[in-house]
Amino acid sequence: MSRKASRAVPGKVISFSSLVETARIKREGKKVNVTNGYILSLKVRNSLGIIETDYIAELEMLNTPARVGIYIQRLIKKLVTAYNEIEAARVKLVNSLGEKQEDGRTILHPESPNWDKFVSEFNDLLAETTDIDTSKVILPGDTTGEHLTKLLGIFEPFISVEGVE
């Protein structure tokens, strides 16, 4: 992960929907440069931290021939690795700034004295970029799957459809 300057606003967390829309995505050869916010938005959590939407798992459910499926699995492995690194950094940030509870959990809430610092550092983390080293996966034109159109939009930097430019 590389450090980039960000425009963190104290007390304001960047929304994941805006990250998907404004994610910086740049393709150079086989490398795709994306923001950490884009990577985290591939698995959307609710306010309790439970994953509600997992676009990576949905990508895995596409009906493709095995010759394409292997490339999708390679892409998924790289995305999950990047996701886990960013999530570990988020957890480390919460653990360093949050309040330890009697049951061993660490909690950080908007009323916490460290909340503004967390938001600023988390926004910086989301604005950092990550290179994903992968070739673009070309799906056959007859690929089917639930939410296919949405997945094509979300994963556009990494996949395309045969015969479509």
Report each predicted region and the residues it spans.
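Generic detector of low-complexity/intrinsically disordered segments
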Residues: E21, M61, K150-I154
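Low-complexity intrinsically disordered segments
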Residues: N84-E165
